[in-house]
Amino acid sequence: MAKTPLFRGSCTAIITPFTKTGVDYEQLERNIEFQYENGTAAVVACGTTGENATLTDGEHSEVVRRVIHAAKGRMKVIAGVGGNNTERVLRRAEDAKFMGADGILMICPYYNKTTQ
């Protein structure tokens, strides 16, 4: 049985733009439109390039929400949720699912020594 890939085509790990006072949500939405107009099939919001480790929980949720809204179903959205705090990672993953993200990007906790 052949499987259909979840993601196909180019995928861009987008930046999270900032002004002097915080996240520049208008520029973020313009960036999503630019990606769509140039044939991008999927975007990663809040990955390492998107400042995942430095965003507050509120900023993270708002960035993911706005990217999903701006994509309007025309592109897949992958939400970066990785980090060292397991509870936060799980909460961000659930939030991304609830908001309609097509996938999540997780990493192994860094700086923590694993038992395996």
Regions found by a protein language model. Give the residues of each.
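Active-site beta->alpha loop and helix N-cap motifs at the rims of alpha/beta catalytic domains
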Residues: 2-12, 16-116
